[in-house]
Amino acid sequence: MPPETAPAPASAPPRTLPHNLEAERSVLGAVLIDNETFNVAAAIIDGKAFFRDAHRRIFERMMDLSERSQPIDLVTLKEELERAGELEEVGGPAYIGSLVDGVPRSTNIEYYAQIVKEKATLRNLIFSANKILGTAYEADQEADL
């Protein structure tokens, strides 16, 4: 007979949700280096796929610029973030400028975006599993098996 309560892990260390900040930075940096890569990334991910909130905001402002057929570069992105009141919240001009540093190759953006998407999918699975667990623990009816 199974126990009535699930044992709590003795000293389970907190776990970080799946993410890859290097891939996120590489997506953003690749777009700043080569605007043509934005459509490749946008076909795979949206802003919600980013783990870091600053990266989500930056990508969403890039999307705004793209939708208005404006170039996406350091100047226009900084201006768009400033207009949205988000420039300092994402790390300021220095952080935006640093995104182009260390981008392995802008032509690899599809692979970087796939990594970001995969990590977002894993996070969503964790959120869904936790929601299911919560619902199961709070259920006041018998489960139909």
Regions found by a protein language model. Give the residues of each.
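Non-catalytic interaction/clamp surfaces of large macromolecular machines
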Residues: 125, 130, 134-145
